[in-house]
Amino acid sequence: MVQAHGGRSRAQPLTLSLGAAMTQPPPEKTPAKKHVRLQERRGSNVALMLDVRSLGAVEPICSVNTPREVTLHFLRTAGHPLTRWALQRQPPSPKQLEEEFLKIPSNFVSPEDLDIPGHASKDRYKTILPNPQSRVCLGRAQSQEDGDYINANYIRGYDGKEKVYIATQGPMPNTVSDFWEMVWQEEVSLIVMLTQLREGKEKCVHYWPTEEETYGPFQIRIQDMKECPEYTVRQLTIQYQEERRSVKHILFSAWPDHQTPESAGPLLRLVAEVEESPETAAHPGPIVVHCSAGIGRTGCFIATRIGCQQLKARGEVDILGIVCQLRLDRGGMIQTAEQYQFLHHTLALYAGQLPEEPSP
């Protein structure tokens, strides 16, 4: 309990001799002052005293988790490991997977949390923003006064390894040179594109050349092209000043927006193409993955590759844990329950392709 006691002004100090103090009668008790909030005492000379005798009656203060803290705790700790056997023979039902998916916090970023002037002009979707703690910052090789912003995040890979991927949106007309600057800056040697240019409306601009083109200070050339049933592979070179590098570009177009492919086989073949690419093993830079918004199909591809690596190395996969890790790095990764179910189906198919293991 906080008690208030009257006090004299500092301009009139109290002086009282010892004798006078002993002969004067005790002062009359004055009624207790009305409780006043601390905010209302600003500028006052009223002294504050804490009555420690009352502390035992005060309930202990309990820490209350904010929604943000709850979100982060869930994403950091949730998991549902499935053995190869369980994934193939006792998988969760579609209803169970939908319920599990809907419990995962999206971890989207609000515009108020992204204090970067002018970023809206470089966002394809105003509600899909890069999480600040993992966003890619451009070093501005172009010497422009556009700041360091690009709608892209570093994404962890298998076993939590840092910066294995960069998840980003499909380039816009005013961000194509930013995209190539990111590719150069991060020493990217592999780009995986998971959208068509138009799906009813524009999903991504044609950011690579037919033969040769210059984007900002970067010159891009097509060296070779290979058509596969489900995807197209292009070998590019990117040149900045006198230095030239090779980049492999894979366009996987058999995946409708907000939906899933007709079968899991093509996606697994795409993962195998990436896994077997010399660019994957020989270069330390991250793999750039994008669709249109950079969260749905992008998240599915990255989660599929991580899940395949878990199954191969451990004999089990934690799909819930994978999605939570992805959403910590970029909000909204894996957009729909249908995509979450398809991810389980795809990894069950992959588990069946691995060498046989004994039943539990």
From Swiss-Prot:
Residues the record lists as Phosphoserine modifications: S44, S93, S110, S143
Residues the entry annotates as binding substrate: D257, C291, S292, A293, G294, I295, G296, R297, Q335
Modified residues (Phosphothreonine): T66
Effect of T66A: Prevents dissociation of bound MAP kinase and enhances their dephosphorylation
Any single GO BP term: MAPK cascade
Positions of the UniProt region annotated as Interaction with MAP kinases: 38-51
Regulation affecting activity: Inhibited in cells after FCER1A triggering.
UniProt superkingdom: Eukaryota
Subcellular location: Cytoplasm; Cytoplasm, Cytoskeleton
Segments traversing the membrane: none
Reactions catalysed according to its record: O-phospho-L-tyrosyl-[protein] + H2O = L-tyrosyl-[protein] + phosphate
Gene coding for it: PTPN7
Lineage of the species this protein comes from: Eukaryota, Metazoa, Chordata, Craniata, Vertebrata
Main subcellular location of this protein, as a coarse class: cytoplasm
Mod. after translation: Phosphorylated on serine residues in resting T-cells. Phosphorylation increases upon exposure to stimuli that increase intracellular cAMP levels. Phosphorylation leads to dissociation of bound MAP kinases.
InterPro entries, alphabetized: Prot-tyrosine_phosphatase-like (IPR029021), PTP_cat (IPR000242), Tyr_Pase_AS (IPR016130), Tyr_Pase_cat (IPR003595), Tyr_Pase_dom (IPR000387), Tyr_Pase_KIM-con (IPR008356)
This protein's UniProt keywords: Cytoplasm, Cytoskeleton, Hydrolase, Oxidation, Phosphoprotein, Protein phosphatase
SMART domains with a match to the protein in the record: PTPc (SM00194), PTPc_motif (SM00404)
GO cellular component, one term: cytoplasm
Enzyme nomenclature, EC number: 3.1.3.48
Enzyme active site: C291
Protein name stated in the entry: Tyrosine-protein phosphatase non-receptor type 7
Spans annotated as Disordered: 1-37
